[in-house]
Amino acid sequence: MEEEEVYIDVNSPVALKVHPSKDLMKFLLSENANLKMASFFTEFEKGFMDIIVGIKIRYKDLSRELLKFVVLNIGNLANEYGKEIRAVFGGLSFKEYLEREKYSYPYSGEKLFQEKISINGTLLLLEVYVKEENYTLICREEGSSNYLIKAIRKVEGPYEALKILEKAKESIKNRDFVSLRKLFSPYEVDFFELYSVFLKGKDTTKLKKLEKEIHELPYMLINGKITYEEYKKRIREIEKEIGLSE
């Protein structure tokens, strides 16, 4: 009786959360033909596509040196293709994906405060939760767990957390995005979703065209591709383009 062959998969993420398109699929099929031994594969989730490159190694052929060689080269290959794919088709690097996920973990702790704001018929909830020394401020639509703002602060006590909540409330009520940016980092506010609330019932064509750029700007900032001054300048230009500032 023949023994069943056992294989080890060595994979590395190339680009995550990419909008699928015919051009992208053609590119992947074409490049697959050029790759030796390794190959691309994809996973779909919620309308987005994760692109991964990998290789199968027969277990009985595996050695420590071979594994080190393969892991290093698959990683380099993923990095090279990732830069090209993200530049042309969009998506996130693995580092950017982890940074985003860090801010999407469910909030927990005891709820201390809650305020409500109505914007264009949409009821927004502003809440503060406390767990140990951490105060978490959340802004979300009523009935939704998706957040527009999520910020974690270590402050001296509930009063300081309440002051942050009140400042956030005033900034949102007054459509004061400049003050909001002073209060929170670019990663703590989902500006695309926030803009969508303010533009509800209006023409959002320009906003949708700029969706990719709005999401990418914070990651360009963290990767040093733009300065904070360049980030602020471009986000202000976007707010003018979509009709949310003069």
Curated annotation (Swiss-Prot):
It comes from the Bacteria. The keyword Coiled coil applies. Residues 204-243 form a coiled coil. Keywords: Coiled coil. This is Uncharacterized protein aq_171.
